[in-house]
Amino acid sequence: MSAIELPPLRSRSEEAARAEHNAQTLAHENANIAGYDESPAVQQVETDAPETKGAPQASFKNYFRVFSYGTKLDYFLISLCCFTSIGAGTAMPLMNIVFGKLVGNFTDYFIPGSNVTRQEFEAEINKLALYIFYLFIGKFAMSYISMLAIRISGMRISAALRLAYLRALFAQPVSVIDTVSPGKVANRITTSSNIVQLAISQHFATLFQSLAFTVGLYVVALVKGWKLTLIASTGLPFILIVYGAMFPPFLRIHQITDKFQEEASAMAYEMFSSIRMIVAFGTESRLAKQHGVMLSKAASNEKRAAPLMGLTMSPAMVAMYGIFGITFWFGIKEYTKGRISSVGDITVVLFSVMMAVMNIGRVASPIISIAKAATAATELFVTIDASFHDTSGVMEPEVTGNAAITFINVAFSYPSRPGVPILKGLDLTITAGKVTAIVGPSGSGKSTIVGLIQRWYDLLGTTATAKKIDETEIPSSSTMASSPIEAVYDNTDKKSKKGKAGEEEEPEQDLGPNTCTGSLSVGRTNLRNVDVRWWRSQIGMVQQEPFLFNDTIYNNIVFGLCGTRYEGLSKDEKKIMVDEACREACAEEFISRLPQGLDTLVGESGIKLSGGQRQRIAIARSIIKRPPILILDEATSAIDVRTERIVQEALDRVSKNRTTIVIAHRLSTIKRADSIVVLRQGQLVEQGTHEELLKNGDGVYYGLVHAQELEMDAEDDDDHSSSLENIKMNDTKEDTASSGFEGHASREDSTYQNVGLLHSLGRLVVEQRHHWILYSVCCIGILGAGAVYPLQAYIFARIINVFTLTGPELVKQGNFWAGMFGVLAGGVGLSYYLLGAASHLISVELTRKYRSEYLSNMIRKPILFFDDKVHSPGSLTSRLSSDSQQVQQLLSMEMSMALIACTNLLGCTIIAFVYGWKLSLVGLFAALPLILGAGLVRTRLEIQLEAENAKVFENSSQFATEAVAGFRTVLSLLMEPMIRSRYDKLLKGHVVEALAKAKYGTIIFAASDSLELACMSLTFWYGGKLLASREYDLIQFFIVYTAIIQGATAAGIWFSFTPSMAQATGAANRILSMRPTSTDPSSYSPLPCSDEGVGIEFQHVSFKYQSRDVPVLSNLNLQILPGQVAALVGSSGCGKSTTLSLLERFYDASSGHILYNGQDITTFSPAEYRKQMSLVSQEPTLYQGSIRENISLSVESASDDDIKQACRDAQIHDFITSLPEGYETRLGPKGMSLSGGQRQRISLARALLRKPKILLLDEATSSLDSESEKYVQEAIERAASEGDRTVIIVAHRLATIQKADVIFVLGSGKVLEKGDHQALLRKKGVYWQMCQAQALNR
């Protein structure tokens, strides 16, 4: 298989207008999507989306444009498909010619006084039957070649399109990618791409074959009798007018529905990404309900298409049977006047036009698929066409990374807030080869400096890199939920939009021209003139929240070599560099203890490692390429004191002879810096060494240091022999779970029952039996539509027999039976209309219900379920979308058509046996089993192929969404080519695996598609013998023949839906398997009541993760009295956060007991037990929606007074009320429109609103600057001072827990020391040494 080739990325000048518009649209459509309830954004989409100028408009030209992603091989395969599809399509028109000759021979033989002998009749019949068999062979070969060719090209082009989308996404500016939800990426790269793939493969071949079929039939009809053909074609304009009027509104409705589905997918991704917080606060039901609101709006919109779906088949069927009546009526007139010499000519014209018109109805399915693909492709092309800038420039030797970085009079504001300057005339020189630390309060510009150095933004005079969105082209920000909070920072003290560490985060959309003046240079070269990729290869960066890929530790570190001169080294040479980097980052010790060592999988975002372990791997990754510039953005914030000291010494070593930029809030880490730069409000206010800056008692730096000082009043001692390095603390997994654990923790029921179609889908339908009215309408429609075929066989036989009559009787009988076709047309039209509309309503409602239930069941799974690497957020989001879509596709018109086929087959079998059992036995039990057997084998192959497709595309989707989630890391590490390469490799693997099965599956498909002709050949041959002996008359023969052919057609229709059935069955099984097992509530004990807080006791508790040989907790014993403030400290991996996880019952202990007021917590209902506690984690979790919604999420119902009091307790009320919209201010994704401290205090308010008996704080202030930490710390102390609440704090920064009632120092899974701050200092043990490391005044 040749490589998947892609067209080159478009230059800035190419298609500039379209690119500019799509860049605006991309930023617009990804801007903060409003959250929960009846948001204006959702209402706007529902009512105005089709008219919104900024929204991408679906166009069929985008469907055809998809083919431009093919290669010469693909174009050859497509051409071959077109040619062979024409051949396969013309088989039936040629068969009609033969059929006409047969009918003529039959009537000539049975006309009274005929001179045709039996021998002559049999010889002619044998010859014509053989011709039909030759047509079967030709159609089989052509069908196989066309379907195989288009499947190959369709898979290849689809893979190229997916890769182009991902490549274009990573070519966008940071400001644009920042606004892209990974959930949307998952939806587009799976669901949307799958829709496109289906439309450019199977449905493309079907459409082309159908067009050739239709044209061929009309050519045959016109040759046989052009007047009769024109009469027979009178229904065609009616069909074209109806379909032409139907599709535009159908496209608009579908496009709006897609928007709702994308929003629902984005929200689902957020939920899966923060599942621990959801479980801790018991918000599963509320968030699932909000997700259901979005799905309900999508369903309400999609129900508007029900009348249109009713017209999918109805017009074609009405026209077809109407044409039958009109054509026979006119043909009989012409026949009696001698203008038509043979009844065979009438039959050929009639059947040709009839089949052509009927085929127009069948063309509806691929056309609808193509219409959906046009919408899906438009969404993909918005990103693909978005403009980007040339990143090339000078590199070595013209410029070097070993040069000073100079800011000269730099003024900068983000595009989203052009009136809020972040940097104000900054003049700063970062000396080459020296360590420069940058400190300052939140919003002072620290992270902005890093962003400018990394060239996430450029200084361009008066405009920023991000594109400006023309507000006349898009809805107002209020309707699209571009965060209103951005507009109000002019009037607050917190003027910058902040992200990690409370610093400025890049804007989420561009709203106008912004200030970007001044000069930024490296040496004597302006940074704008430097090649971006080369420049980033000179920088090693460690961020505060390290992002690791779901890969091995080794690969995560080797990723640091991407885009550098070391990238091409051998594996052995890279291994040496990895080992060296691990030693320098102090990561070698804990890696060596892991069973798989460097080959250990780190899990989604490094979930299987502790925060300290993740950080050290990130440090190793940043220094492995030996960069001349090292940027450490809070590189040690998540590391314990012992590890911090070791890592800090390592960083001191690697910083030598290297330009190092350190951003830190924990000032103990930057005491040794060569220069400390103090920023305030975007300006440099102080600069010097640690000692020099401390001399200014009124300075900003002095105030920051004073806020972090520890009380060290214990008597000094010269005995420091027990160094931190000699304290053995197991560095095992701390913060999160691995793939499993030992003990009796709650596991998901992994039993997956792969039941059949009737059991799985039938169960879904039966459970919704309250829709019995719609079900009844569907049944009536199915019975009516299915009964048409036996009735058609009977009426057709009667009309053919009319031509054996003469004179007035011929005209009388002919007119009567022609009129009966008109009656049949009215009945079948009504049946199909009712069926199409009702089945669509059922499918929409069932899909809404079960997609909502699917997510609700997913988020109620045990935490272990989400620890599994196959259940990553991206994978689950993709599955949620694709499984629901597959079920809906089948439960709509597809299932109805399959049921009609069953009714048809049954009715045709009955009428055939009633009128001629001999011919029926031959036709139905000799030829038909071949069709059934081919279909069954095809079904099995399609199921296997579907399983492979789902597996591979799920993996590729997971990889893509993970890459988007960590895009800053991807850009910083120059991993874009590697990401594309690995994604390309995944896609190619899918293509190869899928095609291996497609070769055999296509044989069966071609057989089931063409065996109808073989059945006809056999029927005519044997029927001819029965007619020759006059055992059968014409009425008997044509009733049986038509019934057999209709039965074979029905079987073909049934098996044409087997791929959808296979996919939908698997999807339904997955949906049902997510249902939880019921638990008897009476088996739980009631919670003991207490007004003085809760006493917590660990009795001999041990805990071990399944993938770890070393236990995290080993016989842990500790007791916390009611109302106490307890702190847990210790090295990374000592079990601090695991202790909180056990308290939250994310996991259960392997052995021992955890007591809640003296009672084992495993005896309580987990939901009721968790209502007694609240968790505030290091990384606050906020969702799209208003501030009020985010705070009140933790309780079922809360009054305004309760919410405001919780915010006052969390010291965030004043800030919220300073916003123009106050508590109704809407937040963007993850609440990134707030600073870190503001997000943390909102999280604390949410926790306090529950009025918990137990408050758990897991590194709640570790990522905050001194100013924000002060606010949060005061809020925590206020919450703990009430005396009726037990507070448990996990912290690395010891200044935050020195006032705790009791401090537990953990190590090796046990308590090493306990006591209050002063008592532990007097011991001069582990805690004393930890304090020594953080004492800034020592």
From Swiss-Prot:
Chief site of localization: membrane
ABC transporter domain residues: 405-706, 1096-1333
| Its membrane topology | Multi-pass membrane protein
| Pathway connected to this protein | Secondary metabolite biosynthesis
- Name the phenotypic consequences of knocking out this gene: Decreases significantly the production of KK-1.
Fetch the Pfam families from UniProt. Answer: ABC_membrane, ABC_tran
Cellular component, GO, one term: plasma membrane
Q: Where is the composition biased (Basic and acidic residues)?
A: 11-21
Per UniProt, what is one GO molecular function of this protein? Answer: ATP binding
Domain named ABC transmembrane type-1: which ranges? 80-372, 777-1063
Subcellular localization is given as: Cell membrane
Keyword field: ATP-binding, Cell membrane, Hydrolase, Membrane, Nucleotide-binding, Repeat, Transmembrane, Transmembrane helix, Transport
Which stretches does the entry tag as region Disordered? 1-21, 473-518, 715-747
Check the record and name the CDD domains matching this protein: ABC_6TM_Pgp_ABCB1_D1_like (cd18577), ABC_6TM_Pgp_ABCB1_D2_like (cd18578), ABC_MTABC3_MDL1_MDL2 (cd03249)
The UniProt similarity line reads:
Belongs to the ABC transporter superfamily. ABCB family. Multidrug resistance exporter (TC 3.A.1.201) subfamily.
Purpose = ABC transporter; part of the gene cluster that mediates the biosynthesis of KK-1, a novel cyclic depsipeptide with 10 residues which is a promising active compound with high activity against many plant pathogens, especially Botrytis cinerea. Is probably directly involved in the secretion of KK-1 and thus confers self-tolerance against KK-1.
**UniProt-listed PANTHER family:** ATP-BINDING CASSETTE TRANSPORTER, ATP-DEPENDENT PERMEASE MDL1, MITOCHONDRIAL
What protein am I looking at? ABC-type transporter kk1G
